[in-house]
């Protein structure tokens, strides 16, 4: 487990530049064996959070607990030993160009004083795990971006860490390679049980891989919880803006062009509903029509798998009278389906 207790981090004024409150009042826990996304814009405090977890920075106040050890209180040899239980994957790979893939993976084991035979066996095991056993003697210049990141992941796992930090590890990769790397991390989490902390500014990464998410803004945790909960009930504007980028609030052009602000005789009210669970969309439409005795039209729908759950957005057309709209919205609220009226169509 990784736990932040009353954390703040302030960088003092330097060479005429004012001090910076990078993190303030941070209290949350990352469950053992979980995949947790930490998301925020540039300057939100993500990098400071990473540096506190791996002990490269000390908090101004509070404690950082990793595997029941107060990392923030350690120094010297004790800190170096604790850091072996924390692996790190970097955005730009940070491989040594003069070393082969195998030798890059071997480096932390050499530093830790492993025997040569044990290093050779461990490196072979890791190359197979990340799917590049045939690239063991290749230099970084001979590898693709995805292959370089696989070497980086193998190196991060070399000392058998319990926590793996992924700092924008897919930001420099194309979409197809990003999906492959995220699939690899999911497999590593399943096989090894390692706790993965995803530091990212991309909600699409959180959607594909994470089960829990923490949203940072201006050094504060503004929202946290299960990914599916955050996707269906975002409360903070910064979270809503992230979700708009990946899920989108846009309607099909053919529908959006027809929506007006005032009802017309015989027209329909357009209501967007958030649903969760396999088959939930069909259930909502059928139950709404049956229990309220209404004609309900499904105008548009989108379903995603998020945090291991199906999360969807339905756009419904219902009779446009105020009375019917009130009944529909009350029914949806009663059964905890978030909903909003978008307007009317003729």
Curated annotation (Swiss-Prot):
InterPro entries: AAA+_ATPase (IPR003593), ABC_transporter-like_ATP-bd (IPR003439), ABC_transporter-like_CS (IPR017871), ACT-like_dom_sf (IPR045865), MetN_ABC (IPR041701), MetN_ABC_transporter-like (IPR050086), NIL_domain (IPR018449), P-loop_NTPase (IPR027417)
CDD domains attached to this UniProt entry: ABC_MetN_methionine_transporter (cd03258)
GO molecular function, one term: ABC-type D-methionine transporter activity
Entry's localization field: Cell inner membrane
Catalyzed reactions per annotation: L-methionine(out) + ATP + H2O = L-methionine(in) + ADP + phosphate + H(+); D-methionine(out) + ATP + H2O = D-methionine(in) + ADP + phosphate + H(+)
Pfam families registered for this protein in UniProt: ABC_tran (PF00005), NIL (PF09383)
Ranges where the ABC transporter domain occurs: 2-243
Name of protein: Methionine import ATP-binding protein MetN
An annotated GO cellular component: plasma membrane
Key word Cell cycle present: no
Keywords noted in UniProt: Amino-acid transport, ATP-binding, Cell inner membrane, Cell membrane, Membrane, Nucleotide-binding, Translocase, Transport
Class of this enzyme: translocase
Family assignment from sequence similarity: Belongs to the ABC transporter superfamily. Methionine importer (TC 3.A.1.24) family.
Binding site for ATP: 40-47
Subunit structure: The complex is composed of two ATP-binding proteins (MetN), two transmembrane proteins (MetI) and a solute-binding protein (MetQ).
SUPFAM superfamilies: ACT-like, P-loop containing nucleoside triphosphate hydrolases
EC numbers: 7.4.2.11
Keyword Cell membrane assigned: yes
Function: Part of the ABC transporter complex MetNIQ involved in methionine import. Responsible for energy coupling to the transport system.
Gene name linked to the record: metN
Topology of this chain in the membrane: Peripheral membrane protein
Gene3D superfamilies, alphabetized: 3.30.70.260, P-loop containing nucleotide triphosphate hydrolases
């Amino acid at each position: 487990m990784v736990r932040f207790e009353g954390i703040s981090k302030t960088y003092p004024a330097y060479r005429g530049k004012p001090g910076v409150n990078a993190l303030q009042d941070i209290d949350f826990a990352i469950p053992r064996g979980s995949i947790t996304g930490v998301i925020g814009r540039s300057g939100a405090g993500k990098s400071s959070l990473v540096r506190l977890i791996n002990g490269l920075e000390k908090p101004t106040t509070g404690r950082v607990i990793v595997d029941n050890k107060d990392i923030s209180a350690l120094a010297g040899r004790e800190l170096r030993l604790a850091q072996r239980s924390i692996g790190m994957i970097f955005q730009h790979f940070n491989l040594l160009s003069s070393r082969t893939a195998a030798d890059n993976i071997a480096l932390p084991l050499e530093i830790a004083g492993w025997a040569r035979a044990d290093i050779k066996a461990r490196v072979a095991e890791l190359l197979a795990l990340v799917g590049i056993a045939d690239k063991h003697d290749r230099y970084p210049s001979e590898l693709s971006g995805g292959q370089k990141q696989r070497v980086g992941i193998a190196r991060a796992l070399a000392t058998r860490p319990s926590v793996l930090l992924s700092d924008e590890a897919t930001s420099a990769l194309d979409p197809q390679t990003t999906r492959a790397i995220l699939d690899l991390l999911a497999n590593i989490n399943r096989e090894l049980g390692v706790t993965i902390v995803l530091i990212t500014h991309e909600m699409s990464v959180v959607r594909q891989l994470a089960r829990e998410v923490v949203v940072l803004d201006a050094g504060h945790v503004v929202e946290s919880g299960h990914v599916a909960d955050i996707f269906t009930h975002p409360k903070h504007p910064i979270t809503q803006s992230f979700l708009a980028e990946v899920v989108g609030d846009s309607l099909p052009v053919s529908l959006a062009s027809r929506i007006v602000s005032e009802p017309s005789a015989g027209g329909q009210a357009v209501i967007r509903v958030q649903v969760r669970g396999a088959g939930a969309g069909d259930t909502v439409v059928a139950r709404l029509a049956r229990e309220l005795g209404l004609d309900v039209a499904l105008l548009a729908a989108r379903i995603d798998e998020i945090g291991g759950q199906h999360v969807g957005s339905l756009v419904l057309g219902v009779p446009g009278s105020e009375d019917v709209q009130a009944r529909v919205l009350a029914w949806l609220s009663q059964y905890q389906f978030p909903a909003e009226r978008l307007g009317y169509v003729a």
